[in-house]
């Protein structure tokens, strides 16, 4: 396709006098800020290819750097705006369609209308891809750009022809009728549009309704059907109908229940049998193999898949895990209407709980291959706009929101009491913990709290005054780090500036989110650094110093695994003394073969030497002595006793460096070597680019700047005397291939993840604690302990790591128990409960960061078998297959002891005895 130019210019055309890069940057920044300060529904934004936008950013940024540093810019002015890499190849140039699954910030950027107009004015190009700003949310309103409008497949009932219709998800049903009728030529009074999801008539849409398409549960790429009054074609009459099944989301929980094997039911849905349990509790002697059937004989529920509505695999995975959580299913398959809290300002008027309960009933009905969770997703998007649209999300984030939302919708506490918290006053931990748990329960009472919430102890210690603060907080799940994500191994080569030892590589373990100070501390311990010594860290690239690491609090994430880092072991210069760095580069001579006119070249090799020197003038002899000291441990044992006198073949004169190759070039003119015969080496003064090379003699005087650079010429004599291989064999910071192999062999246990979660660690600099004794914010040490464990225990494995420089997914295999997960040693409050757990569900993530695919494993406890839920596809799976490196969220249920089981049964008998007594009186 040809990029249009004039069609997309401003009315006044392209500027005859283009702005400078600095002015362009300033104008775009000001217009963007102005737009962010005036967000309104319907504001226009334009999609721009990230590839083109990056080239523009480099152009304006490099030009700005040129102004401040005086260095020339290497980024050229970009050509016309080109969006063709982000649109479908067969798109109409007047109606371009974005490629699916694009990621903002990686594939495209969004700019306000005024910024787009300016960019087109300066660069022309296109095509323009216009999108609208929409406002979403029920309680908390948030703005977002609808990058992918709703795409619907319209089937014309007259001839079964199909047409694509695109509308914003907030467009009304009335607007949909207008557009469909305009496209098909059907009068609005004769048109009937059906929700035709899965090629079935799920509900007739009201032509006068202002309800949005999203609220009507219409989703991306689904079918709609238009029929016309007065036509009774075979096509229209053949269309199947299921009534109005999914047209509306129920506002009351259904009182119908899934039939339980054995016995009649009460009007409220409870079984009359006293030991009723949809999912019998596991005891240490009973693994559930002989449990009762969930449905009638020959029927099996819980094996329905969930249709993918467009990148909703993350939601389906989390839902299947919850849909196989025994106490949650027991609760929602009964009558829970009395627990709905419609007045909770933190809830969703009960609508989320009702939608979830309705979905669970469908999943546990027999005879269903797959269920489309459209009504549930509609409610989810209304109350959690971050999950609207069709981008990939995180199953754990969805799970966290859903559990919290269900709790608030089902919270039996209608008016939360105010309870003044008492100070612990050195009271026993169990007394304080129980008091805080009762306070929590007085304000939060739901099936979610009863089943899923535990309590941990948090201890903070002030590093200055030693003040100890202990709190007890509830938790819904445990987000445990993978130990490999907490630390990293780094290999650094240490050079001894006094010449006492050969260069030595050291591998140290440091916090992954640590600082340069952490690395220097670990390295100092490894190499037995003396108190009067220091380490200077630097990155070596192309045989030159690329950068120094001198700010202690800088993040280690700036150092990549494939870089070469060295540390120079230096004697500390007395405080108050002025110091400068002396960099010593190494050059080896090679006779040019192809171009004899160029004479001889010197190519840089090895690792530079760096040391501190005083700012007093240095002579050539001083520098020669420093070089001799560095090289002394490299002296070959049987090296000839020849002293270098500068008479070797080839010389360095005023030379330049080829920046791309690192080669120093000199003309063929001979240099008088008599003046530097006293020096052990041929030394040349150079600059940071390797330019302005000048030879040094013994009597030369140099006034050191911040950094002074010299180059040592290595000829045959130097190579005979010294082993230069010690300068060339720098290891990388981390060998990734070796690490990956080692990780797979050793793996990680779930216990090591839990121990890393509970380990004492200092708070981050952005998460300081206010010490009540010091009256200051302190970087306190924090320690967590498990205090109270719930019946349903969820582990979230933190596989995704984010930092300023790196986004990554850890595919390390975590070895987690399927049976007999014993957590008793990690629980501080031993109260006689069982701390044995059995795995019953797993949310899996396959692929990389920002995409991939989610599935779920779940155990059907009725028949003691595991199943794989991959969206709508459900298949049986061996228990041995569920442990793999894709495991992301683990669901465990408590294995009760025999005593606990008997106590629970007695409590249940009493409950149902009271219920039967109440019914007898009522009759």
Swiss-Prot record:
Residues 65-91 are annotated as: Disordered. It catalyses: Thiol-dependent hydrolysis of ester, thioester, amide, peptide and isopeptide bonds formed by the C-terminal Gly of ubiquitin (a 76-residue protein attached to proteins as an intracellular targeting signal). The keyword Transferase does not apply. Gene3D superfamilies: Cysteine proteinases, DUSP-like, Phosphatidylinositol 3-kinase Catalytic Subunit, Chain A, domain 1. Keywords: Hydrolase, Protease, Thiol protease, Ubl conjugation pathway. Its EC number is 3.4.19.12. Residues 19-134 form the DUSP domain. CDD domains: Peptidase_C19R. Residues 304-895 form the USP domain. PROSITE patterns: DUSP, USP_1, USP_2, USP_3. One of its GO terms (biological process) is proteolysis. GO terms for molecular function: cysteine-type deubiquitinase activity. The active site is at 313 (nucleophile), 853 (proton acceptor). InterPro entries: DUSP-like_sf, Papain-like_cys_pep_sf, Pept_C19_DUSP, Peptidase_C19_UCH, Ub_carboxyl-term_hydrolase, USP_CS, USP_dom. Recognizes and hydrolyzes the peptide bond at the C-terminal Gly of ubiquitin. Involved in the processing of poly-ubiquitin precursors as well as that of ubiquitinated proteins. Belongs to the peptidase C19 family. This is Ubiquitin carboxyl-terminal hydrolase 10. It comes from Arabidopsis thaliana (Mouse-ear cress).
């Amino acid at each position: 396709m040809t990029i249009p130019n004039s069609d997309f210019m401003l009315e006044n055309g392209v500027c005859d006098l283009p702005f400078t890069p600095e002015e362009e940057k300033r104008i775009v920044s000001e217009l963007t800020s102005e737009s962010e300060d005036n967000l309104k529904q319907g504001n226009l934004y334009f999609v721009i290819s990230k590839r083109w936008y990056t080239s523009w950013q480099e152009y304006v940024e490099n030009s700005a750097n040129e102004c401040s540093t005086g260095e020339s810019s290497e980024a050229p002015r970009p050509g016309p705006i080109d969006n063709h890499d982000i649109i479908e190849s067969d798109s109409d140039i007047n109606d371009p369609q974005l490629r699916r699954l694009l990621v903002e910030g990686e594939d495209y950027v969004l700019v306000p209308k005024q910024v787009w107009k300016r960019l087109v004015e300066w660069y022309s190009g296109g095509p323009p891809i216009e999108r609208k700003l929409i406002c979403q949310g029920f309680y908390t309103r948030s703005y977002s750009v609808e990058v992918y409008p709703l795409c619907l497949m319209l089937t014309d009932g007259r001839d079964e022809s199909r047409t694509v219709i695109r509308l914003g998800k907030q467009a009304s049903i009335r607007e949909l009728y207008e557009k469909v009728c305009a496209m098909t030529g059907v009068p609005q009074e004769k048109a009937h549009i059906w929700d035709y999801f899965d090629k079935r008539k799920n509900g007739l849409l009201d032509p006068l309704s202002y309800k949005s398409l999203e609220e009507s549960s219409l989703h991306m790429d689904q079918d709609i059907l238009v029929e016309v009054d007065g036509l009774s074609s075979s096509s229209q009459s053949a269309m199947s109908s299921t009534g109005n099944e999914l047209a509306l989301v129920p506002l009351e929980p259904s009182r119908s229940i899934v039939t339980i094997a054995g016995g009649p039911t009460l009007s409220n849905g409870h079984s009359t049998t006293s030991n009723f349990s949809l999912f019998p509790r596991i005891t240490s002697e009973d693994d559930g193999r002989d449990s009762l059937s969930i449905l009638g004989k020959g029927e099996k529920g819980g094996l329905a898949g969930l249709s993918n509505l467009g990148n909703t695999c993350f939601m389906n995975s989390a839902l299947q895990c919850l849909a196989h959580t025994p106490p949650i299913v027991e609760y929602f398959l009964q009558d829970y209407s009395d627990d709905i809290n419609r007045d909770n300002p933190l809830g969703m008027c009960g609508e989320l709980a009702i939608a979830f309960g309705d979905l669970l009933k469908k999943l546990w009905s027999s005879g269903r291959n797959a269920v489309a969770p459209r009504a549930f997703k509609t409610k989810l998007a209304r109350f959690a706009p971050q999950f609207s649209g069709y981008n990939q999300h995180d199953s754990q984030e969805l799970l966290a929101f859903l559990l919290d939302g269900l709790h608030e919708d089902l919270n039996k506490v209608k008016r939360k009491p105010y309870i003044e918290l008492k100070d612990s006053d050195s009271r026993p931990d169990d007394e304080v913990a129980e008091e805080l748990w009762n306070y929590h329960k007085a304000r939060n009472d739901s099936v979610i709290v009863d089943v899923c919430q535990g309590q941990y102890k948090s201890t903070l210690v002030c590093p200055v005054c030693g003040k100890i603060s202990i709190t007890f907080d509830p938790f819904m799940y445990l987000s445990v780090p993978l130990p490999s994500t907490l630390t990293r191994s780094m290999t650094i080569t240490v050079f001894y500036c006094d010449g006492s030892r050969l260069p030595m590589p050291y591998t140290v373990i440091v916090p992954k989110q640590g600082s340069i100070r952490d690395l220097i501390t670990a390295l100092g311990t490894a190499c037995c650094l003396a108190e009067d010594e220091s380490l200077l860290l630097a990155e070596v690239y192309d045989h030159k110093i690329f950068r120094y690491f001198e700010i202690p609090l800088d993040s280690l994430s700036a150092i990549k695994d494939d870089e070469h880092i060295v540390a120079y072991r230096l004697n500390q210069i007395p405080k108050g003394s002025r110091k400068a760095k002396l960099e010593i580069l190494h050059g080896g001579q090679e006779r040019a073969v192809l171009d004899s006119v160029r004479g001889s070249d010197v190519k840089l090799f090895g690792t530079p030497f760096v040391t501190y020197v005083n700012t007093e003038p240095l002579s050539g002899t001083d520098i020669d002595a420093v070089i001799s000291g560095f090289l002394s441990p490299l002296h070959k044992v049987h090296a000839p006793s020849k002293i270098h006198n500068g008479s070797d073949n080839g010389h360095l004169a005023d030379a330049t460096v080829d920046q791309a190759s690192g080669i120093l070039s000199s003309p063929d003119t001979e240099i008088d070597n008599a003046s530097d015969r006293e020096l052990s080496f041929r030394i040349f003064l150079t600059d940071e680019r390797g330019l302005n090379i000048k030879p040094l003699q013994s009597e030369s005087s140099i006034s050191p700047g911040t950094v002074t650079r010299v180059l040592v010429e290595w000829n045959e004599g130097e190579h005979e005397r010294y082993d230069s291989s010690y300068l060339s064999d720098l290891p990388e910071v981390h060998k990734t291939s070796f690490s990956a192999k080692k990780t797979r062999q050793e793996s990680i246990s779930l216990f090591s993840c839990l121990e890393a979660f509970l380990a004492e660690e200092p708070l981050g600099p952005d998460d300081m604690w206010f010490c009540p004794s010091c009256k200051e914010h302190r970087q306190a040490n924090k320690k967590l302990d498990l205090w109270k464990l719930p019946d349903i225990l969820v582990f979230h494995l933190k596989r995704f790591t984010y930092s300023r420089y790196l986004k990554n997914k850890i595919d390390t295999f975590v070895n987690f128990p399927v049976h007999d997960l014993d957590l008793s040693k990690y629980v501080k409050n031993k109260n006689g409960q069982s701390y044995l757990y059995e795995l019953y569900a797993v949310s899996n993530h396959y692929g990389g960061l920002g995409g991939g695919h989610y599935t779920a494993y779940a155990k059907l406890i009725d028949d003691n078998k595991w199943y794989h839920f991959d969206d709508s596809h459900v298949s049986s799976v061996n228990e041995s297959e569920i442990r793999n490196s894709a495991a992301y969220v683990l669901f465990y249920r408590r294995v009760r002891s025999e005593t606990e089981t008997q106590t629970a049964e007695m409590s249940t008998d009493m409950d149902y005895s009271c219920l039967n007594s109440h019914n007898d009186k009522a009759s």
